[in-house]
């Protein structure tokens, strides 16, 4: 595996770890702290998603992650968060 491939893989792995960290953070927040309708929940979610999107954009600009892969990562996280939100509000 070339150095560039290793860098690309490491960048994508790190972005996935960050996405998983956000999902975990929101799960903990919903389970223990606040309701999805709480402004604090929305603020944390918006801030975390904005930060991850900036990470993805940066990795794409450096050529470490394909633009479409970055979009798919964000879509996957948004879908998982949406499912989590639905499950929490339908309980």
From Swiss-Prot:
Family designation: Belongs to the UPF0358 family.
Matching Pfam families: DUF1507
Disulfide bonds: none
Source species of the chain: Staphylococcus epidermidis (strain ATCC 35984 / DSM 28319 / BCRC 17069 / CCUG 31568 / BM 3577 / RP62A)
Superkingdom, natural source: Bacteria
Protein name from the UniProt record: UPF0358 protein SERP0701
